[in-house]
Amino acid sequence: VEQYRDAVWQLWKEANAGFEEEKLIALDTLSSNSSGYWKLPENLEPNAVMPYCWGMKGAVETGAELPLFLYLHGSGPKEREWSTGLKICRNFDDAPSVYFIPQIPNEGDYYRWWQKAKQFAWEKLLRQALLLGEIDPNRVYVFGISEGGYGSQRLASFYADYWAAAGP
């Protein structure tokens, strides 16, 4: 079984290497400087650009697989909510770990973390993060505050096979 699992994993990596898509920025120390953005499909949400922070906390042993936390902010003004989320996540005592902290692309009717355009982003995140080989696929978590907490619960039902836990 292990031999076939490894063969399927290699084929999966090769198939994904051929995707022409925006990639995650290089994994670095979690800070406001470790940020990038993804353009989400126009047919799923108009004018949707998702800024994100992507980074590690703590010293990492060579070859160690780290937990990944997806943090979803609340529904206040998106700039303030996003910067507050980064501060909160940097203070959690969970190092070594990796965080993906997105900013909601649009306010108004599109201020929901479970909508199709954001699902596109989560599927891209999961695929790209797991392909790095540094993330423990059994320790991928989603959580948030307020609208982010609600979103984490909705996403728990959509991606139950991916999350180790989901919590508001």
Predicted regions and their residues:
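Gly/Ser/Thr-rich beta-alpha loop segments that engage phosphate groups in nucleotides
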Residues: G76-K78, S146, Y150
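Gly/Ser-rich "nucleophile elbow"/oxyanion-hole loop immediately N-terminal to the catalytic nucleophile
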Residues: A59-A64, Y111-E147, S157-Y162
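A short, hydrophobic beta-strand element of the alpha/beta-hydrolase
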Residues: Y71, G167-P168
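Active-site machinery of serine-nucleophile hydrolases
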Residues: L66-L68, L72-L131
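Accessory recognition modules or surfaces
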Residues: Y150, A164-G167
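A domain-start/cap signature at the N-terminus of enzymes
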Residues: V1-L66, E147
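Hydrolases whose catalytic domains are alpha/beta-hydrolase-1, hotdog thioesterase
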Residues: G151-L155
